[in-house]
Amino acid sequence: MSKVLVLKSSILAGYSQSNQLSDYFVEQWSEKHSADEITVRDLAANPIPVLDGELVGALRPSDAPLTPRQQEALALSDELIAELKAHDVIVIAAPMYNFNISTQLKNYFDLVARAGVTFRYTENGPEGLVTGKKAIVITSRGGIHKDGPTDLVTPYLSTFLGFIGITDVKFVFAEGIAYGPEMAAKAQSDAKAAIDSIVAA
């Protein structure tokens, strides 16, 4: 039995293409892998606090007493990291906003990236500590950006996930959604076909 963690990060709730596609993934995965356990975390509905000068102090090893706000941030960071490490498959629904990931997803990464916990520095360079996982990124875009200079989502997510130790990453693209109903329907259809292929593998 595998454990699957689905991270939603769209601000558009049910209208979101990435949310709809991640829901489709959950339906298909549940049908094909009925014994697996699926956890869904909606980072827009339940937002992660923005990392600031006070909160960053909670995430660095120190003997200094923590403020109540820092204690909350550290506890949340511990919870998010434990959840991430406890799952085998990580599904990230990542809409493109202004060429990059959403603020909601970035805030999550900022609390998950902790030296000595999810990565460490060695004499050979950084080493990821969140290993043995597979990641599936479902990314929706209004325009066409794949493989072009305006796609900052794909390289950023590949780099971040690899940095913490997740190197088996597959991407599902839904592009051209803003180009009209026909293109949006084709984008959904193509993305669902890609999801079907991943689920069946």
Swiss-Prot record:
UniProt EC number: 1.6.5.-, 1.7.1.17
Keyword match Transcription regulation: no
Reactions catalysed according to its record: 2 a quinone + NADH + H(+) = 2 a 1,4-benzosemiquinone + NAD(+); N,N-dimethyl-1,4-phenylenediamine + anthranilate + 2 NAD(+) = 2-(4-dimethylaminophenyl)diazenylbenzoate + 2 NADH + 2 H(+)
Molecular-function annotations in GO: electron transfer activity; FMN binding; oxidoreductase activity, acting on NAD(P)H as acceptor; oxidoreductase activity, acting on NAD(P)H, quinone or similar compound as acceptor
Keywords: Flavoprotein, FMN, NAD, Oxidoreductase
UniProt: FMN binding residues: S10, S16, Q17, S18, M96, Y97, N98, F99, S140, R141, G142, G143
Cofactor binding notes: Binds 1 FMN per subunit.
Keyword match tRNA-binding: no
Pfam family, one: Flavodoxin_2
Cofactor annotation: FMN
Assembly and binders: Homodimer.
Listed HAMAP family: Azoreductase_type1
Physiological role: Quinone reductase that provides resistance to thiol-specific stress caused by electrophilic quinones.
Family: Belongs to the azoreductase type 1 family.
Protein known as: FMN-dependent NADH:quinone oxidoreductase
Organism: Shigella flexneri
Name of the gene encoding the protein in the UniProt record: azoR
